[in-house]
Amino acid sequence: MWCSRNCRPRFAFMASYLPPKAGWRPAMVEIKSVKVENPEGLNVVIGQTHFIKTAEDLYEAIENSVPQAKFGIAFCEASGPCLVRVEGNDGALKDLAVRNALAIGAGHTFVIFLRDAYPVNVLRAIRDTPEVVTIFCATSNPVDVLVAENPRGCGIVGVIDGERPKGVETEADRKDRLEFLRKIGYKLG
Protein backbone atom coordinates (compact mmCIF):
# COMPACT_ATOMS: atom_id res chain seq x y z
CA MET A 1 0.00 0.00 0.00
CA TRP A 2 1.25 3.45 -0.88
CA CYS A 3 0.45 6.76 0.77
CA SER A 4 -1.04 9.42 -1.47
CA ARG A 5 1.35 12.28 -0.64
CA ASN A 6 4.93 11.17 -1.14
CA CYS A 7 4.77 7.62 -2.52
CA ARG A 8 6.55 6.03 0.41
CA PRO A 9 5.31 2.68 1.64
CA ARG A 10 2.56 3.25 4.19
CA PHE A 11 3.99 0.64 6.57
CA ALA A 12 7.32 2.52 6.71
CA PHE A 13 5.48 5.73 7.65
CA MET A 14 3.45 3.98 10.34
CA ALA A 15 6.32 1.93 11.76
CA SER A 16 7.66 4.91 13.70
CA TYR A 17 4.37 5.11 15.61
CA LEU A 18 4.28 1.48 16.72
CA PRO A 19 5.25 1.09 20.38
CA PRO A 20 7.81 -1.66 21.10
CA LYS A 21 6.55 -4.79 22.85
CA ALA A 22 7.20 -4.99 26.57
CA GLY A 23 10.71 -6.28 27.20
CA TRP A 24 11.66 -5.89 23.54
CA ARG A 25 15.26 -5.00 22.77
CA PRO A 26 16.85 -4.79 19.37
CA ALA A 27 19.11 -7.78 18.74
CA MET A 28 22.71 -6.97 18.00
CA VAL A 29 23.88 -8.39 14.71
CA GLU A 30 27.54 -8.89 13.88
CA ILE A 31 28.63 -9.43 10.31
CA LYS A 32 31.76 -11.48 9.83
CA SER A 33 33.66 -12.57 6.75
CA VAL A 34 34.42 -16.30 6.52
CA LYS A 35 37.08 -17.28 3.98
CA VAL A 36 36.18 -20.50 2.18
CA GLU A 37 38.96 -23.06 2.56
CA ASN A 38 39.71 -24.33 -0.94
CA PRO A 39 43.41 -25.24 -1.25
CA GLU A 40 43.08 -26.92 -4.67
CA GLY A 41 40.95 -24.21 -6.29
CA LEU A 42 38.07 -26.64 -6.75
CA ASN A 43 34.61 -25.57 -7.82
CA VAL A 44 32.36 -24.83 -4.87
CA VAL A 45 28.60 -24.25 -4.75
CA ILE A 46 27.11 -22.58 -1.68
CA GLY A 47 23.37 -22.22 -1.24
CA GLN A 48 20.39 -22.22 1.08
CA THR A 49 17.76 -24.89 1.43
CA HIS A 50 15.10 -25.90 3.93
CA PHE A 51 14.73 -29.59 4.64
CA ILE A 52 16.64 -32.55 6.10
CA LYS A 53 16.45 -34.59 2.88
CA THR A 54 18.53 -31.96 1.06
CA ALA A 55 21.87 -33.76 1.32
CA GLU A 56 20.52 -36.95 -0.23
CA ASP A 57 18.57 -35.11 -2.94
CA LEU A 58 21.61 -33.01 -3.89
CA TYR A 59 23.68 -36.21 -4.10
CA GLU A 60 21.18 -37.66 -6.57
CA ALA A 61 21.01 -34.41 -8.57
CA ILE A 62 24.78 -34.26 -9.06
CA GLU A 63 25.18 -38.00 -9.67
CA ASN A 64 22.44 -37.96 -12.32
CA SER A 65 23.87 -34.85 -14.04
CA VAL A 66 27.55 -35.86 -14.21
CA PRO A 67 28.03 -39.54 -13.26
CA GLN A 68 31.85 -39.29 -13.26
CA ALA A 69 31.91 -36.23 -10.95
CA LYS A 70 33.59 -36.49 -7.56
CA PHE A 71 31.91 -34.38 -4.89
CA GLY A 72 31.25 -33.74 -1.24
CA ILE A 73 28.12 -32.17 0.24
CA ALA A 74 27.59 -30.71 3.71
CA PHE A 75 24.18 -29.41 4.84
CA CYS A 76 23.65 -27.49 8.10
CA GLU A 77 20.38 -28.25 9.85
CA ALA A 78 18.64 -25.26 11.43
CA SER A 79 16.46 -27.04 14.01
CA GLY A 80 16.25 -30.26 15.97
CA PRO A 81 19.71 -31.73 16.53
CA CYS A 82 21.27 -29.00 14.27
CA LEU A 83 23.79 -31.40 12.78
CA VAL A 84 25.87 -31.07 9.64
CA ARG A 85 24.52 -33.76 7.29
CA VAL A 86 27.09 -35.19 4.88
CA GLU A 87 26.87 -36.97 1.52
CA GLY A 88 29.18 -37.45 -1.44
CA ASN A 89 31.36 -39.95 -3.22
CA ASP A 90 34.81 -38.59 -2.29
CA GLY A 91 35.98 -38.65 1.33
CA ALA A 92 38.38 -35.70 1.01
CA LEU A 93 35.72 -33.52 -0.65
CA LYS A 94 33.18 -34.49 2.01
CA ASP A 95 35.67 -33.46 4.73
CA LEU A 96 36.38 -30.16 2.96
CA ALA A 97 32.65 -29.43 2.64
CA VAL A 98 32.13 -30.18 6.35
CA ARG A 99 35.00 -27.91 7.47
CA ASN A 100 33.58 -25.04 5.43
CA ALA A 101 29.98 -25.65 6.53
CA LEU A 102 31.08 -25.57 10.18
CA ALA A 103 33.13 -22.40 9.62
CA ILE A 104 30.15 -20.65 7.97
CA GLY A 105 27.81 -22.02 10.63
CA ALA A 106 24.56 -20.79 9.05
CA GLY A 107 21.47 -22.94 9.36
CA HIS A 108 19.88 -24.42 6.25
CA THR A 109 22.94 -23.79 4.11
CA PHE A 110 24.79 -26.28 1.98
CA VAL A 111 28.34 -26.44 0.66
CA ILE A 112 29.27 -28.62 -2.32
CA PHE A 113 32.81 -29.19 -3.61
CA LEU A 114 33.18 -30.61 -7.14
CA ARG A 115 35.98 -32.37 -8.98
CA ASP A 116 35.73 -33.56 -12.63
CA ALA A 117 32.66 -31.39 -13.19
CA TYR A 118 31.88 -27.70 -13.53
CA PRO A 119 29.01 -25.91 -11.77
CA VAL A 120 27.44 -25.22 -15.17
CA ASN A 121 26.99 -29.00 -15.49
CA VAL A 122 25.03 -29.36 -12.23
CA LEU A 123 23.41 -26.01 -11.40
CA ARG A 124 20.14 -26.69 -13.21
CA ALA A 125 19.73 -29.97 -11.32
CA ILE A 126 20.64 -28.29 -8.02
CA ARG A 127 18.15 -25.45 -8.63
CA ASP A 128 15.47 -27.98 -9.60
CA THR A 129 15.86 -29.77 -6.26
CA PRO A 130 12.56 -28.85 -4.54
CA GLU A 131 14.07 -27.83 -1.23
CA VAL A 132 16.73 -25.48 -2.66
CA VAL A 133 15.86 -21.85 -1.95
CA THR A 134 18.83 -20.01 -3.46
CA ILE A 135 22.40 -20.36 -4.64
CA PHE A 136 24.87 -17.78 -3.37
CA CYS A 137 27.81 -18.76 -5.56
CA ALA A 138 29.17 -21.40 -7.91
CA THR A 139 32.84 -20.76 -8.58
CA SER A 140 36.45 -21.83 -8.33
CA ASN A 141 37.52 -18.29 -7.38
CA PRO A 142 38.56 -17.39 -3.84
CA VAL A 143 35.33 -16.83 -1.88
CA ASP A 144 34.49 -15.03 1.34
CA VAL A 145 31.04 -15.63 2.83
CA LEU A 146 29.48 -12.69 4.68
CA VAL A 147 27.69 -14.13 7.70
CA ALA A 148 25.33 -12.21 9.98
CA GLU A 149 25.28 -13.54 13.53
CA ASN A 150 22.90 -12.74 16.38
CA PRO A 151 22.38 -14.56 19.69
CA ARG A 152 20.15 -17.22 18.06
CA GLY A 153 22.20 -18.15 15.02
CA CYS A 154 23.82 -17.21 11.74
CA GLY A 155 22.67 -16.49 8.21
CA ILE A 156 24.45 -15.79 4.95
CA VAL A 157 24.12 -12.18 3.84
CA GLY A 158 26.08 -12.64 0.62
CA VAL A 159 29.41 -13.67 -0.83
CA ILE A 160 32.51 -12.00 -2.21
CA ASP A 161 33.41 -14.07 -5.27
CA GLY A 162 36.84 -13.41 -6.76
CA GLU A 163 38.33 -9.97 -7.32
CA ARG A 164 37.24 -6.51 -8.46
CA PRO A 165 37.09 -5.73 -12.19
CA LYS A 166 40.39 -4.41 -13.57
CA GLY A 167 38.96 -2.88 -16.74
CA VAL A 168 36.68 -3.52 -19.71
CA GLU A 169 37.51 -6.17 -22.29
CA THR A 170 39.14 -5.13 -25.56
CA GLU A 171 38.52 -6.77 -28.92
CA ALA A 172 41.57 -8.99 -28.27
CA ASP A 173 40.13 -9.99 -24.86
CA ARG A 174 36.78 -10.77 -26.50
CA LYS A 175 38.50 -12.93 -29.13
CA ASP A 176 40.39 -14.79 -26.37
CA ARG A 177 37.11 -15.39 -24.48
CA LEU A 178 35.35 -16.77 -27.55
CA GLU A 179 38.30 -19.03 -28.41
CA PHE A 180 38.52 -20.30 -24.83
CA LEU A 181 34.83 -21.30 -24.76
CA ARG A 182 35.27 -23.27 -27.96
CA LYS A 183 38.50 -24.85 -26.77
CA ILE A 184 36.83 -26.29 -23.66
CA GLY A 185 33.77 -27.45 -25.64
CA TYR A 186 31.09 -25.05 -24.40
CA LYS A 187 30.47 -23.44 -27.79
CA LEU A 188 30.50 -24.93 -31.27
CA GLY A 189 33.83 -24.50 -33.09
Locate the predicted segments by residue.
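Gly/Ser/Thr-rich loops at beta-strand to alpha-helix junctions
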Residues: 51-52, 79-80, 90-91, 115-120, ...
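Short, Lys/Arg-enriched N-terminal segments with co-localized hydrophobic residues
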Residues: 9-27
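Structural motif
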Residues: 42-45, 69-74, 83, 108-111, ...
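N-terminal, charge-rich interaction modules
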Residues: 27-86, 171-189
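Helix-rich interaction surfaces within compact, conserved domain-sized segments
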Residues: 100-106, 117-189
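Positively charged, polar, low-complexity stretches
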Residues: 78-102
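A general structural signal for well-ordered alpha-helical packing
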Residues: 55-59, 94-101, 123
